[in-house]
Amino acid sequence: MKVAVIGAAGGIGQALALLLKNGLPAGSDLALYDIAPVTPGVAADLSHIPTPVSIKGYGGVDPTPALEGADVVLISAGVARKPGMDRSDLFNVNAGIIKSLAEKIAVVCPKACVGIITNPVNTTVAIAADVLKKAGVYDKRRLFGITTLDIIRSETFVAELKGKTPSDIQVPVIGGHSGVTILPLLSQVEGVEFSDEEIKALTPRIQNAGTEVVEAKAGGGSATLSMGQAAYRFGLSLVRALQGEQGIVECAYVEGDGKHARFFAQPVLLGKDGVEEVIDYGKLSTFEQEALNNMLDTLTSDITLGEEFAAK
């Protein structure tokens, strides 16, 4: 099993690479790529950690050696948010990066499962999908927007609020991966009851948690370490499912049945081909249904922006 981390010299990429070096199944190959020349050094550094995972790093303009033979590609390449920016402000730079990487993936490893971390995810996933489609290699089961950060934040904040162990809390999060499009289904958290006031306070806190970190870092970056952990959780789940483990469910932003929008985040059952089944998210509370209805215009316009960029 070969996993490639693209954007591996950045804050998210380095954190993700460290976790994968420690946590991938024995015998896995880990390839790191970044345009930054430091990348082989990041791999050399990580190679000293005594785990049965081989690691190589590649810098420069061509990601081909990292992508060759990859089963899973995790993309965190791009610029990070700074104070005063929202995820859509990243579009102008990051859209071009995702487009060129998707063009390369289409040629080098068209069968790989691709997880996109690069923001704005609502838009970058649509770009990747249409670039792969144009190349005739798109398989919607193998392309994911990684929204796991919204899930781990939800689990953490709920556990803190209710005095529970975070690992005992499961919060499905649907919609997209920015602002109002992030919808935690707090009504579905087992063993926990929320007042209306708690839901009205917790929902925007989860939606705006990224901004909380950007502001706390005071211009020094965005959520890199927690995002690295989130991408690791999703990436490892995907690897385990590809290797035949049954019953692995994660929320992810995928192309489903188009009921709400072409791409939508919801629970998915992972399998040997990527998405085995998109799972119905169940009954929503009145608050959640209203929030869903109110986000769809934003989500749809985010997706359209990506489709239009890919068509250029």
Curated annotation (Swiss-Prot):
Active site positions, chain numbering = 177
Query: What PROSITE patterns does the record point to?
Result: MDH
Reactions listed under catalytic activity? (S)-malate + NAD(+) = oxaloacetate + NADH + H(+)
Q: Which domain of life is it from?
A: Bacteria
Enzyme Commission number(s) from the entry: 1.1.1.37
Mention one GO molecular function.
Answer: L-malate dehydrogenase (NAD+) activity
User: What's an example GO cellular component term for this entry?
Assistant: cytoplasm
EC top class named in words: oxidoreductase
Keywords annotated in UniProt = NAD, Oxidoreductase, Tricarboxylic acid cycle
> Where, in this chain's numbering, is NAD(+) bound?
7-13, 34, 94, 117-119, 227
Q: Name one GO biological process term.
A: malate metabolic process
So where does this one cross the membrane?
Answer: none
Q: Which Pfam families match?
A: Ldh_1_C (PF02866), Ldh_1_N (PF00056)
Q: Where does substrate bind?
A: 81, 87, 119, 153
Presence of keyword NAD: yes
Q: What HAMAP family does its record include?
A: Malate_dehydrog_1
Q: How does it assemble?
A: Homodimer.
PANTHER family per UniProt = MALATE AND LACTATE DEHYDROGENASE, MALATE DEHYDROGENASE, MITOCHONDRIAL
Q: Which family does it belong to?
A: Belongs to the LDH/MDH superfamily. MDH type 1 family.
The UniProt function text for this chain reads:
Catalyzes the reversible oxidation of malate to oxaloacetate.
Q: What is this protein called?
A: Malate dehydrogenase
